[in-house]
């Protein structure tokens, strides 16, 4: 991808540098940030711009305020946390557009940081509105996209805004995301193994169709496995099944086998009599799931099967948990897979909020080669799609 990066720009000194970041971080009921990985991930880009003598203007969204100004979606907690991480004052603008914001930007000195208020307080952001994008650019001189996680969205601060800058480039986080993706999917060291989990096949269908043509092995866990198992003729009790996708699931499975791709599905599970942390549970083979019970995690024999499938892997990509890991009774399968992936000798790439969360909860994140900050963006790249945010970076490349 012929993308220009921030360290390839001739000079940032004294320039107003607009950086699109993704500070869409989880908050508790008191508006305290509970996890700040996404803020930490862009520190190298922000620090590089500051060290180069730039005036740094940051823009982000938080939550889904749907075009309305709602205090609970203010960027204030992010400004506070960033200030602590940078060890310097980060001013929070009262808005993201308008005269007052413009005055604040014009008054900035090199080495100062201003965080704009939530860009999604305006409908124009999600509508990719050119007028809103122009107002948001605030006459800044250089645009940097370091928000991989929203680069699959054609939104004003990601796509339309680039038309109003003479210089457009990407940050270091974007560079990492693209580099690791290319290592895994375009120039992989084989065998290449994909692990897919999560509740539904429908959300991963296009990913699967793309992966069948690229990988050596596919491992399917989580709720989505039971649509495949039912399609193959198993009685899966009350387990989650997308009936309308049975035929497509069977076609995908058959296509993979025809292409010589090894396709792994659970052989046993942790079944429960209801969807509840207090449910009665038991380990059962797939053939013996009781009629009124549901499978909510992979079982120990499946963990062994999946772990053995990873033994000779040289590249592993993983998206989606193996069970309802938020409930302790159904978390063992996911955590066992975290351990198997973390302790493999392969290049390991994990993407998606739930999988990321599981890796952190297991305390194994340091052993994973790369944890992507993107959920939807990561999946769309796996699908082989061109992301709007990356496309405009390529068009404005070197």
Swiss-Prot record:
EC number: 2.7.2.3
GO biological process: gluconeogenesis; glycolytic process
Pathways involved: Carbohydrate degradation; glycolysis; pyruvate from D-glyceraldehyde 3-phosphate: step 2/5
Main location: cytoplasm
Subcellular location: Cytoplasm
Catalytic activity: (2R)-3-phosphoglycerate + ATP = (2R)-3-phospho-glyceroyl phosphate + ADP
InterPro entries: Phosphoglycerate_kinase, Phosphoglycerate_kinase_CS, Phosphoglycerate_kinase_N, Phosphoglycerate_kinase_sf
Binding residue positions for ATP: 204, 326, 352-355
Keyword ATP-binding applies: yes
Matching Gene3D superfamilies: Phosphoglycerate kinase, N-terminal domain (3.40.50.1260)
Gene Ontology annotations for the cellular component aspect, listed alphabetically: cytosol
Binding site residues for substrate: 22-24, 38, 61-64, 120, 153
Keyword line: ATP-binding, Cytoplasm, Glycolysis, Kinase, Nucleotide-binding, Transferase
Keyword GTP-binding on entry: no
Top class in the EC scheme: transferase
GO MF terms, alphabetically ordered: ADP binding; ATP binding; phosphoglycerate kinase activity
Protein family per UniProt: Belongs to the phosphoglycerate kinase family.
Complexes and interactors: Monomer.
Name the record gives this protein: Phosphoglycerate kinase
Native species: Geobacter metallireducens (strain ATCC 53774 / DSM 7210 / GS-15)
């Amino acid at each position: 991808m012929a993308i220009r990066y921030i360290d390839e720009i001739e000079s940032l000194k004294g320039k107003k540098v607009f950086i699109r970041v993704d500070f869409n971080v989880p908050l508790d009921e008191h508006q305290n940030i509970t996890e700040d990985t996404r803020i930490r991930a862009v520190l190298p880009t922000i620090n590089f711009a500051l060290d180069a003598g730039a005036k740094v203007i940051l823009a982000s969204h938080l939550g889904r305020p749907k075009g309305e100004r709602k205090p609970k979606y203010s960027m204030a907690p992010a400004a506070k946390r960033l200030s602590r991480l940078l060890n310097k004052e980060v001013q929070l603008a009262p808005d993201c557009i308008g005269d007052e914001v413009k005055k604040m930007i014009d008054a900035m000195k090199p080495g100062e940081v201003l965080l704009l208020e939530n860009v999604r307080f305006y409908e124009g952001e999600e509508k990719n509105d050119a007028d809103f994008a122009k107002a948001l650019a605030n006459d800044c001189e250089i645009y940097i996209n370091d928000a991989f996680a929203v680069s699959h969205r054609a939104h004003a601060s990601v796509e339309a805004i680039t038309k109003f800058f003479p210089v457009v480039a990407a940050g270091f986080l974007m560079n990492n995301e693209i580099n690791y993706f290319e290592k895994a999917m375009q120039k992989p060291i084989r065998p290449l193994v994909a692990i897919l989990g999560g509740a539904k096949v429908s959300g991963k269908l296009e990913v699967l169709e793309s992966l069948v043509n690229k990988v050596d092995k596919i491992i399917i866990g989580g709720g989505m496995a039971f649509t495949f198992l039912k399609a193959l003729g198993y009685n899966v009790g009350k387990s989650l099944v997308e009936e309308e996708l049975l035929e497509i699931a069977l076609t995908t499975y058959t296509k993979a086998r025809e292409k010589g791709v090894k396709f792994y599905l659970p052989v046993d599970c942790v079944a429960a009599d209801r969807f509840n942390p207090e449910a009665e549970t038991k380990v059962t083979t797939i053939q013996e799931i009781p009629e009124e019970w549901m499978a909510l995690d992979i079982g120990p024999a499946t963990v062994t099967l999946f772990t053995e499938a990873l033994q000779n892997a040289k590249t592993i990509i993983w998206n989606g948990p193996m069970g309802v890991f938020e409930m302790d009774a159904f978390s063992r399968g996911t955590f066992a897979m975290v351990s198997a992936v973390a302790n493999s000798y392969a290049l390991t790439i994990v993407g998606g909020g739930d999988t990321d969360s599981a890796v952190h909860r297991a305390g194994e994140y340091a052993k994973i080669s790369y944890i992507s900050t993107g959920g939807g963006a990561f999946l769309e790249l796996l699908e082989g799609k061109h992301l709007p945010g990356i496309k405009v970076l390529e068009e404005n490349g070197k």
